[in-house]
């Protein structure tokens, strides 16, 4: 296995222009494919998850032109649901942002589809979405294990009506159903069961859907009413925001090491909830400056925090490694859905934090981290999880090197992450 050893980083300073958001990129690509008209997406993320979506759309008959650097994509929309002429098997890697929304969208039209992916994808639940789709008239079956991919889907259309979706495990189930619902033949009322996790990701979905011209009534995140027989309309140009989750590593680096880091591509007008990561850093003692399309972090004296991170679970991972540099014990709470991400992130994070010397308590939906007097050099296993690799790169901001196993796993969202980190540390 390839590994990368990062030597201690003595200073951090500079500016980072963020790659496009994974969450925004894949949502916008799917809606552009379903829309009438042509959409030109700029600042599209070039990563594994986006390639899986693009490959699936091409197989489904969608025409698009991708720039040489793969950050601009002109999509000619179908103006309708997918209706390929032949049965298709679509391999979606470990891309939840492709698997869940496509599973819903493929129910709308005609055709037979198998959706599959990497072994980890077959361990990531999808049952709550499938149950809701079946209630709206979909024909979906599990090919291996109940409630998990791979799926076999026969396009029958969705008839809407009142459906329930469990929101307690992943907001992607609701996102997927919301994006399909406007093309249903009858009005759809979606009732949320349990506490809805990651609400800011639903805000991203609703914002992009509105940009593509459809109407939804959001009743305090408990009920969503979606009128029937709507059509997505291409907005023309669509700028993909920078990835706010990816910003967290650079902002944290400034907070830990000093100097000043300016991150552009997100700001106080961002539609991504993960920009709130900067507020968590501020609570730890970092000086934060906000602009419309930038965030600046400057060194503070980092103190431990005890905080509910249900709203920003991805960015919360960065707090776990920043906690290694904070005074006191940090508690990250209400993050059960870490367990159903690219890996079981609670177990993985606890294991790897202990390797560098931290005292860690891992609960069902929380983790507490007490830093050691000095960090130990360790080889960090990344579990084919891009965020594990990027989070633990921050250990190099100490006086100790850190070895990252399988550093290439960052290709899921940020292929040149380690190059960007090096630019800030030169």
Curated annotation (Swiss-Prot):
The lineage of its organism: Bacteria, Pseudomonadati, Pseudomonadota, Gammaproteobacteria, Vibrionales. The active site is at 314 (proton acceptor). Belongs to the EPSP synthase family. Pathway: Metabolic intermediate biosynthesis; chorismate biosynthesis; chorismate from D-erythrose 4-phosphate and phosphoenolpyruvate: step 6/7. It is found in: Cytoplasm. Monomer. It comes from Aliivibrio fischeri (strain MJ11). GO terms for molecular function: 3-phosphoshikimate 1-carboxyvinyltransferase activity. Phosphoenolpyruvate binds at residues 22, 96, 124, 172, 345, 387, 412. Keywords: Amino-acid biosynthesis, Aromatic amino acid biosynthesis, Cytoplasm, Transferase. One of its GO terms (cellular component) is cytoplasm. InterPro entries: Enolpyruvate_Tfrase_dom, Enolpyruvate_Tfrase_sf, EPSP_synthase, EPSP_synthase_CS, RNA3'P_cycl/enolpyr_Trfase_a/b. It catalyses: 3-phosphoshikimate + phosphoenolpyruvate = 5-O-(1-carboxyvinyl)-3-phosphoshikimate + phosphate. This is 3-phosphoshikimate 1-carboxyvinyltransferase. It comes from the Bacteria.
